[in-house]
Structure formats: C-alpha cells, structure tokens
A protein has these predicted regions:
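Ser/Thr- (and often Asn-) enriched beta-sheet segments in non-cytosolic proteins
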Residues: 32-36, 41, 142-144, 167-170, ...
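Short beta-strand segments
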Residues: 133, 189-193
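Short gly/pro-enriched beta-turn/loop segments at secondary-structure junctions
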Residues: 139-140, 186-188
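Switch II (G3) loop of P-loop NTPases
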Residues: 195-197
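S-adenosyl-L-methionine
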Residues: 1-186
Length: 198
C-alpha cells in the first residue's frame, strides 16, 4: 500500500507530503519498494543504513542535479560512462536508461551493491550496462574490502581497507581494462590520456 502511495506522490510532485508519512511508515517497512520516477525505476531498501532508503524518504533520486548534469553533457552515442563505486546504480540507471545508445561500465567490489545494481538493471530492462566486481585504482593489485554495513555510516560508505580484514578483492586500472578489451571505447581515436591512471 505504501509503495502505491509513494508512486502517486512522485507522479503528482507531492514529495513534501511524504515527510510526514515516512515518519509513520518507516517502522513498518521491511521489503524493498519499487519507486517509479516515470522514465526509470529503482528498488529502494528501507533498512536504516541502506543508501537507497534516502529515496523512500525524499521521493527523489540520489544526487539528481549531478545525474542531470552528466546526462546533459552526453552529446553523442560514442560516449561511454564509467561509474566507479556504482552501488545500486544511482548514476548508472538513469544515464543508461535515458542515453540508451551509449555504453555504461559499472565497478563495485561489493557483492551486495552489485546485486542491487543487477536488480535495478533488470527492473528497467537495460541492455547497455556492463558491470564488474572489482575495485578501480592506479595499479593492478589485490586489497581487502569490508562491506559489513554495521562498520559504516551507510551502504554508500564502503571502502577498500588498508588493514588485512574483510574479503580479498582485485583492484584493476581503467588503462588495463581498456587494453584487455573489457572497456571498449566506441571511437578508435579515443583520448587515452583523458583516463590514464584511473
């Protein structure tokens, strides 16, 4: 029932009304909710430290102005978008949905985050996102990563650890991913210096 109310409020631009409703319903929410932002949808998770919970509370996408700025910068279909630390797809989902001719590459070492991203890709029927369960850095190496949410402020705060705790993960560079054909620039004369060292 609350999901239907939320989507009604989004469609009719009544986000402020939800601030009151959320204070009541937040205690009863247990399952993920589909939020329909008309041109794309997100699963939002109501658990306290889930980053996507912010969307349930505010009925807006995360960092909407930044997402819109990126979308407006994409002028042709030869563009690729690289989302490092993609989490549930806050940037990638709207960009891939609204610019469905470009290639979107998502990187996140968190299996939990990638599962949420995969669910959102499927929910939107998106075909132009490729995702990788790796960290991105200057050099290829292994590192440790802990995505136990109890250790962080929220699910958007996960980070690679300098300590020897958590799961061992791969770190790869954008240069290496291009050279190995994992990331394929659409133009052969792409500016490699523009992404060197990432």
């Amino acid at each position: 029932m609350y999901e239907a109310i939320l989507n009604f409020l989004i469609r009719n631009n009544f986000q402020d009304l939800n601030k009151i409703l959320f204070k009541v319903f937040k205690f009863f929410l247990k399952k993920k909710i589909v939020l329909n932002f008309l041109t794309y949808k997100f699963y939002a998770y109501p658990q306290k430290k889930e980053l996507s919970r912010w969307m349930i509370k505010n009925l807006k996408i995360w960092e909407k102005s930044s997402v819109e700025l990126i979308i407006n910068q994409i002028k042709n279909d030869n563009t690729i978008f690289i989302d490092i630390g993609s989490n549930y797809g806050a940037y990638s989902i709207p960009i891939a949905k609204l610019k469905n001719k470009i290639n979107v590459y998502c990187f996140d070492p968190s299996e939990k985050a990638l599962n949420q991203l995969k669910d959102n890709i499927k929910l939107n029927g998106i075909k132009n996102i490729k995702y990788f369960k790796v960290g991105v850095g200057e050099k290829n190496k292994t590192a440790f990563f802990n995505d136990e949410i109890k250790n962080y402020k929220n699910s958007g705060s996960y980070e690679i650890s300098n300590k020897y705790s958590g799961k061992k993960i791969l770190i790869n560079s954008i240069d290496n991913l291009i050279e190995n054909g994992e990331i394929i620039p659409k133009k052969k004369n792409y500016n490699k210096n523009g992404c060197r060292g990432l």
